[in-house]
Amino acid sequence: MTDAVRTLKEWTDAARKIVFFGGAGVSTESGIPDFRSTGGLYHQEWKYPPETILSHTFYKSNPEEFFRFYRAKMLCPGAKPNAAHKKLAEWEREGKLLAVVTQNIDGLHQAAGSKQVYELHGSVHRNYCEKCGKFYDLDHILHTTGVPRCDCGGVIKPDVVLYEEALNDRVIDGAVNAIAQADLLIVGGTSLNVWPAAGLINYFRGDRLALINKSPVPRDLAAGLVITDPIGEVLSQL
């Protein structure tokens, strides 16, 4: 155990209101590619850049191509929770963790047993008809081809926040409230480049901020503790 991990262990042992703020790096150890790392989605070949395909405009104007990309690149139904997801769920069961705030849409925190999860960018597990509002699960999207349609004829849209779309106010309020109450904020697996989500950590009022990410991020200087190891590997030692 490194000195930094040992310090983090002391912090987590003493904390009573941990909030975890996570991004794509949390799920890479479950085999889900992140967006911006080498080998991530933004470095893969496609007819259009991912930022374009995953926009509201593209979804509306070219739904066939959107869903082809979405099924091929955004859905990983075989992924399982890793050590990071499991440790966070364990802390919640012990009453040490207030909430998980995640930029991920994979539902792996819930699969690990976490209950209080604020999904800033939505979830692939929720899909709704744009016409009548009927709910469809992930299996329905996986087992249809082309543009998925409801019995009423409406397009079934994944409940994920696309570029050009606003975040859910209720989710934001819950995340802000949790972060403001935290006595320890652990930020993991995110480059903090996606706004407005990254701005939420400004609501943290405590003095113990730990940052776990494989590459340096803009907030390194503000963090009391910076660890550049895989997050599952780090949390499993705590």
Question: Where are the regions that the model predicts?
Answer:
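Conserved catalytic core of sirtuin-type NAD+-dependent deacylases
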Residues: M1-L238
